[in-house]
């Protein structure tokens, strides 16, 4: 690809795609260790989440990946909450958690219950 740090900072869209790919790769590895499955999510309203984790017991978690700041984290959290409220847990299993993975350095749980975790904090 011929990418350098300078070229990535000049093309934030490509940088974002690579970051998302790295997060998905790491989530897939973690899912493999706990016998969970990782999928892309799109519903009948055409809403998407970057990933859905389905655990062995049928419970699930929705994940969004964001490189931006607080505005992007807020928007991603709202999106996850809106999607989750429309999922029929009688058919799918129960919601385990909602997660936004970021580039930051602080992990926390928001007042709305959504977890925000930097990629660097995801460890096996």
Q: Predicted regions span which residues?
A:
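A cross-kingdom feature that marks ATP-driven nucleic-acid transaction machinery
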Residues: 1-124
